[in-house]
């Protein structure tokens, strides 16, 4: 993507129509908004964290925003360009449940080894708890990140090896109504 393009080329537009769940008009609107907010055509980690802070003013979303940024930044160059942004937005807002679960798995799999360790899950859940702050009243069996992660691993880690495969994560998530509802949070919003 060029730095100061005001419109997507026809080739770029066709490519994005094929790889997202947005139509041409929506893509052009998102593109315009992206460049209005990011005139350089790139969003860096600190800018991304500032955006999250606006949505979670009563907590500290910086760690969680960093984890999300790392999944959005598909080519790992330290910036999110429009294509990376719109592809991730497409999955999180309009994707099928399985697509969302794969995306969420990538979020939790911090070292990208194809497994989610207890520690990786704990780091993400801890970041989520810090982000929501005191806004959410949690049940007693989930009122600390450790309790929540223990509950998740007890439910999902079928072979009890201390790590979750993609299959274990997807199957377990589908059985947990709180995970399914969290993954459906943005449905229909964009």
From Swiss-Prot:
Ca(2+) 2 binds at residues 109, 111, 113, 120. A lipid is attached at residue 2 (N-myristoyl glycine). The keyword Lipoprotein applies. Residues 40-58, 60-95, 96-131, 144-179 form the EF-hand domain. Keywords: Calcium, Lipoprotein, Membrane, Metal-binding, Myristate, Repeat, Sporulation. Signal peptide: none annotated. Ca(2+) 3 binds at residues 157, 159, 161, 163, 168. PROSITE patterns: EF_HAND_1, EF_HAND_2. One of its GO terms (cellular component) is trans-Golgi network membrane. It is found in: Membrane. GO terms for biological process: calcium-mediated signaling; negative regulation of calcium ion import across plasma membrane; phosphatidylinositol phosphate biosynthetic process; regulation of signal transduction; sporulation resulting in formation of a cellular spore. SMART domains: EFh. Negatively regulates sporulation perhaps by controlling Ca(2+)-dependent desensitization of git3. This is Calcium-binding protein NCS-1. It comes from Schizosaccharomyces pombe (strain 972 / ATCC 24843). The gene is ncs1.
């Amino acid at each position: 993507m060029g730095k100061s393009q005001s419109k997507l080329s026809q080739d770029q537009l066709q490519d994005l129509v094929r790889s997202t769940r947005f139509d041409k008009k929506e893509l052009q609107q998102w593109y315009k908004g992206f460049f209005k907010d990011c005139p350089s055509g790139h969003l860096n980690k600190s800018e991304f964290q500032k955006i999250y802070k606006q949505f979670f003013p009563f907590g500290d979303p910086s760690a969680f925003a960093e984890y999300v940024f790392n999944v959005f930044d598909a080519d790992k160059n330290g910036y999110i360009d429009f294509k990376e942004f719109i592809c991730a937005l497409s999955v999180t807002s309009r994707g099928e449940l399985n697509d969302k679960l794969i995306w969420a798995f990538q979020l939790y799999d911090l070292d990208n080894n194809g497994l989610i360790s207890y520690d990786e899950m704990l780091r993400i859940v801890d970041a989520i708890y810090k982000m929501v702050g005191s806004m959410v009243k949690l049940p007693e069996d989930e009122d600390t990140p450790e309790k929540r992660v223990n509950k998740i691993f007890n439910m999902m880690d079928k072979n009890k090896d201390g790590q979750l495969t993609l299959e274990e994560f997807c199957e377990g998530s589908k059985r947990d109504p709180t995970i399914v509802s969290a993954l459906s949070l943005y449905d229909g919003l964009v």
